[in-house]
Amino acid sequence: MSLEDLKSKDVDALRAELLELRQTQMKLRLQKASGQLQQTHQIRNVRRDIARIKTLLTQKKVRV
């Protein structure tokens, strides 16, 4: 997910994306705990995407 794509979204779309990524993160954690996850780097990528979205939400809140 690119930063430019995220910047073009409004606050509601970012919140929806954040919710979706948190659900994905939970699924990946459960898969890792049960030993089913082969590509563990996905957890890190999702965590970083969540951080990007939270940063953008904070920036947009400050501007308003």
From Swiss-Prot:
Highest taxon, organism lineage: Bacteria
GO biological process: translation
Keyword Ribosomal protein: yes
GO cellular component: cytosolic large ribosomal subunit
Keyword Ribosomal protein included in the entry's annotation: yes
PROSITE patterns: RIBOSOMAL_L29
Name used for this protein in its record: Large ribosomal subunit protein uL29
